[in-house]
């Protein structure tokens, strides 16, 4: 069994190690090591197309993670007061949202937004004052942020609800006994207890949004995120520059995931 586990881990991580190794290749060929160099990292960071795509990815990831953290936390707290069959139904919907393949979410979001835009654009043209050009709703950063927020909300709900379930309910009861209002109890008791989980949900949401290609491919419109740029570049061949981008993204993602895990562990110790 141990040998099987080792083989599985090698199968998963050897390709990642190869990408990291060849990102330091001095030559242009991605499959032939010709010395050690960090020049591809410099070229990557000086490439304006990469920087524009990186900026878009950071904006989308931060905004989506922030919205998902706020709305997901609100939903998790609200679900605490629901019991019985309705609670089971909501739980099922949340887990289904996490399990749905990204391609399904991308196609469904694309169809939904196109339908809404087709209905609203003529209405805006009629209602907009004469002499001014009415705005035209189209695919872009807004649609991408909306799609990622809807997908990531379920993830935040699961993380925050797990922390809420592990909270010491006597603290909330003590706050009520001291005549604290529900809002004061949430602000001074509940929120500090679940904040590590909220922050962990934010970091995980940021990571998933930053790395996402499938949903972004459908709803980004003319905008280019870093995963879309990498996909377009790979179609022309793998280069050390692509390896450098992959290595940097991998490093940032691992750092965020480790930080999120530490926050969850810290929150678990505090709730006890």
Q: Could you say what each language-model-derived stretch is?
A:
Residues 29-34, 38, 43, 86, ...:
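Membrane-interfacial helix termini and adjacent extracytoplasmic/periplasmic loops
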Residues 14-48, 219-221, 272:
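Short membrane-interfacial helix/loop motifs at transmembrane-helix boundaries
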Residues 3-4, 9-16, 96, 150, ...:
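Transmembrane alpha-helices
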Residues 63-94, 107, 111-115, 169, ...:
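Transmembrane-helix boundary motif in ABC transporter permease subunits
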Residues 1-3, 83-86, 161-176, 186-188, ...:
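C-terminal transmembrane helix and the adjacent membrane-cytosol boundary/short C-terminal tail
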Residues 41-50, 210, 215-259:
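Interhelical loop and adjacent transmembrane-helix boundary motif
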Residues 14-17, 21, 70-75, 107, ...:
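Membrane-embedded alpha-helices of multi-pass transport/permease systems
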Residues 55, 59-71, 75, 187, ...:
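Hydrophobic alpha-helical transmembrane segments of multipass integral membrane proteins
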């Amino acid at each position: 069994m141990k040998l099987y586990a080792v083989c599985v881990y090698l199968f998963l991580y050897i390709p990642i190690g190869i990408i990291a190794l060849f990102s330091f290749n001095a030559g242009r060929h991605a499959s032939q090591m010709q010395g050690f160099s960090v020049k591809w990292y410099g070229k990557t960071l000086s490439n304006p197309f990469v920087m524009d795509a990186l900026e878009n990815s950071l904006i989308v990831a931060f905004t989506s993670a922030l919205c998902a953290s706020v709305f997901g936390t609100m939903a998790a707290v609200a679900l605490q007061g629901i019991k019985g069959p309705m609670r089971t139904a909501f739980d099922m919907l949340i887990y289904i949202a996490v399990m749905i393949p990204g391609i399904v979410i991308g196609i469904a979001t694309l169809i939904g937004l196109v339908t809404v835009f087709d209905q609203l654009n003529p209405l805006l043209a009629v209602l907009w004052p004469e002499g001014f050009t009415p705005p035209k709703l189209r695919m872009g950063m807004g649609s991408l942020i909306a799609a990622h927020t809807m997908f990531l909300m379920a993830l935040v709900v699961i993380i925050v609800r797990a922390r809420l379930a592990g909270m010491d309910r006597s603290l909330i009861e003590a706050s009520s006994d001291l005549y604290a209002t529900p809002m004061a109890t949430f602000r001074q008791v509940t929120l500090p207890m679940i904040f590590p989980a909220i922050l962990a949900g934010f970091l995980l949401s940021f990571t998933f949004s930053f790395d996402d290609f499938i949903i972004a491919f459908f709803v980004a419109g003319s905008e280019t995120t870093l995963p879309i740029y990498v996909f377009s570049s790979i179609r022309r061949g793998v280069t050390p520059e692509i390896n450098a981008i992959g290595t940097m993204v991998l490093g940032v993602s691992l750092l965020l995931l480790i930080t999120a895990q530490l926050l969850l562990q810290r929150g678990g110790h505090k709730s006890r």
